[in-house]
């Protein structure tokens, strides 16, 4: 699981 963007959501 990798957090994307500003680490608010993970993809």
Swiss-Prot record:
Molecular-function GO terms, alphabetical: toxin activity
Broad class of where this protein is predominantly found: secreted
Top-level taxon of the source organism: Eukaryota
GO-annotated cellular components: extracellular region
Cysteine amide carried by residues: 11
Tissue specificity field: Expressed by the venom duct.
Processing after translation: Contains 2 disulfide bonds that can be either 'C1-C3, C2-C4' or 'C1-C4, C2-C3', since these disulfide connectivities have been observed for conotoxins with cysteine framework V (for examples, see AC P0DQQ7 and AC P81755).
Keyword entries, A-Z: Amidation, Disulfide bond, Secreted, Toxin
Location within or outside the cell: Secreted
Family under the similarity heading: Belongs to the conotoxin T superfamily.
Domain-level remarks: The cysteine framework is V (CC-CC).
Protein name as catalogued: Conotoxin tx5g
Organism of derivation: Conus textile
